[in-house]
């Protein structure tokens, strides 16, 4: 019975909502009909005549002031709307309408799910947003002391944001600490050092830890932050390697004795892999590229499961420097798999290899006459695939936007990843003759294949909408963040811009040509009310005069 009563109330409520939704037009016409019938008792005609006489007595100066004031007010609204859109990415009027006015007017989504389903949907969307905007450690991140700090000394600008450095601090605590650190004094000091915000305090803590013991993580901190050259950093990393290998061998023998020993061994493994990868990067930066490639290959064979460091991206860049394109293709064959996460490095390197086969002889004029060959079509499709994954990269490769130092963390498919890729790989594209020309001729064609407005992707998942916000947190304030897709101007900005321009033009014309504008206004009003007068005359001619007389007497 209770369920039946609830169902009846729901049906009654839906009927009332339906009546308010569809019958308001009928009530509107009924009100218009009543006003027309009561026009004599209400003296509507006399009032209209009085208003028209008053308007005829107004001078052109009044209309100039009226249109000028309207133009000023709409201009102020336009300026505020534009400022709000530039700062928050949305229209203030639209936001207020959706957030406050729509609930008051009873705007309800009839297809809204139940409360439980809505909660589940919100949870799913939040999980999707988090996964889309996951921030990754930059595999090719620079050295803080030897590169980032040198940039600050020269330019006076900070290349890293607080958000980026805070993420690095969290990474260090995850990789370089464990629950048993308090049992060893040097590791206990370093555990506090990784949480310290002041760089000098971190460096002092690392020196203090080294006075107690040969601590690998202390050497890592000094190599990253205190060393002012790559040579100094390499020396410190070699000392860290010696200490780290000893800790790794000891913990490897005890890893099966308990959960604490297993956690310690995991920490020592992370430390050892990090040191060897950074040593390989030092060798690459110092010109010993073949040595760096060997170190990276050995590291990937020794620890094949530690894919979180993305060492294959370091290997790809080093192999491109050696112009070992066959080895690059072999690495891509392993990692450019549908089941593995993609990156700009993988997609654009694959495009570079296919472009290399045809770019030296490619001519857009010849291609337009004879059509694209199979190899050229494959190269263009690879470029389109790469651009769809990260549409920000081509502007940096084509030097349409200036590069900055890459951050320590990147957002895949975002501007930060594009900067990190182009910073290291621009030289490889320039080395391949005609590759940048082919990219310049074909990359914009990608956007004709992607559905708009981006409900679904073409080869990848739809482009995430949160990249701009995350990139603004990762990139310094002096860099202009690349935004995709470009935001369209809201309707109210266009409307107020048109209203401001139109009223300003009316004010100018009324001031310069008052008589002509008066004639124009009268002609416009008479034309505007001509259909209404025609309808009224037809109604009076159709209705019987006796009925019409009785209705007007009511």
UniProtKB/Swiss-Prot annotation:
Protein name per the record: Suppressor of tumorigenicity 7 protein homolog
Compartment annotation: Membrane
CDD domains, per database record: ST7
GO CC list: membrane
InterPro entries per UniProt: ST7 (IPR007311)
Alphabetized UniProt keyword annotations: Membrane, Transmembrane, Transmembrane helix
Transmembrane segments: 15-35, 62-82, 489-509, 516-536
PANTHER family: SUPPRESSION OF TUMORIGENICITY 7, SUPPRESSOR OF TUMORIGENICITY 7 PROTEIN
Organism: Gallus gallus (Chicken)
Annotated family: Belongs to the ST7 family.
Topological category with respect to the lipid bilayer: Multi-pass membrane protein
């Amino acid at each position: 019975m209770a369920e039946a009563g609830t169902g009846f109330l729901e049906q009654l409520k839906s009927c009332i909502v339906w009546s308010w939704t569809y019958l308001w037009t009928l009530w509107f016409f009924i009100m218009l009909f009543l006003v027309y019938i009561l026009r004599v008792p209400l003296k509507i005609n006399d009032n209209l005549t009085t208003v028209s006489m008053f308007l005829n007595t107004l001078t052109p100066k009044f209309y100039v002031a009226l249109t000028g004031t309207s133009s000023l007010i709409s201009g102020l609204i336009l300026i505020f709307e534009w400022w709000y859109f530039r700062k928050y990415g949305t229209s203030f009027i639209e936001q207020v309408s959706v957030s406050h006015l729509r609930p008051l007017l009873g705007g309800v989504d009839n297809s809204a799910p139940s409360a439980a389903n809505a909660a589940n949907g919100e949870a799913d969307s939040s999980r999707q947003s988090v996964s889309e905007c996951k921030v990754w450690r930059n595999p090719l991140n620079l050295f803080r002391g030897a590169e980032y700090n040198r940039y600050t000394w020269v330019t006076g600008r900070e290349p890293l944001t607080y958000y980026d450095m805070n993420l690095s601090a969290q990474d260090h605590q995850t990789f370089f600490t464990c629950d048993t650190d308090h049992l060893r004094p040097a590791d206990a000091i370093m555990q506090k050092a990784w949480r310290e915000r002041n760089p000098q305090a971190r460096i002092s803590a690392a020196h203090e830890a080294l006075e107690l013991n040969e601590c690998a993580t202390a050497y890592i901190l000094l190599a990253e932050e205190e060393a002012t050259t790559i040579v100094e950093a390499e020396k410190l990393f070699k000392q860290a390697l010696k200490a780290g290998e000893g800790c790794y061998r000891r913990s490897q023998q005890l890893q099966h004795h308990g959960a604490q020993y297993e956690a310690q061994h995991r920490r020592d493994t992370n430390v050892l892999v990090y040191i060897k990868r950074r040593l390989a990067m030092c060798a690459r930066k110092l010109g010993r590229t073949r040595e760096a490639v060997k170190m990276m290959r050995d590291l990937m064979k020794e620890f094949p499961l530690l894919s979180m460091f993305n060492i294959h991206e370091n290997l790809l860049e080093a192999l491109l420097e050696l112009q070992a394109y066959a080895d690059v293709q072999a690495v891509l064959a392993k990692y450019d798999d549908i089941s593995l996460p993609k990156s700009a490095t993988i997609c654009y390197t694959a495009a570079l290899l296919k472009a290399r086969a045809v770019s030296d002889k490619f001519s857009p004029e010849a291609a337009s006459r004879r059509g694209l060959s199979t190899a050229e079509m494959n190269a263009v499709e690879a470029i389109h695939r790469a651009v769809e994954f990260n549409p920000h990269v081509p502007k940096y490769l084509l030097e349409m936007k200036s590069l900055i130092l890459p951050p320590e963390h990147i957002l895949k498919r975002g501007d930060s990843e594009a900067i990190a890729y182009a910073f290291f790989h621009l030289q490889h594209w320039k080395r391949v003759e005609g590759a940048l020309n082919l990219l310049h001729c074909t990359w914009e064609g990608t956007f004709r294949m992607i559905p708009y407005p981006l409900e679904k992707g073409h080869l990848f998942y739809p482009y995430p909408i949160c990249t701009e916000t995350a990139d603004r947190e990762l990139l310094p304030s002096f860099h202009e963040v690349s935004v995709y897709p470009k935001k369209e101007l809201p309707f109210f900005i266009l409307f107020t811009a048109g209203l401001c321009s139109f009223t300003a033009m009316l004010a100018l014309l009324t001031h310069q040509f008052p008589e002509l504008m008066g004639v124009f206004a009268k002609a416009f009003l008479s034309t505007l009310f001509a259909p209404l007068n025609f309808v009224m005359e037809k109604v009076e001619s159709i209705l019987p005069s006796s009925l019409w007389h009785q209705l007007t007497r009511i």
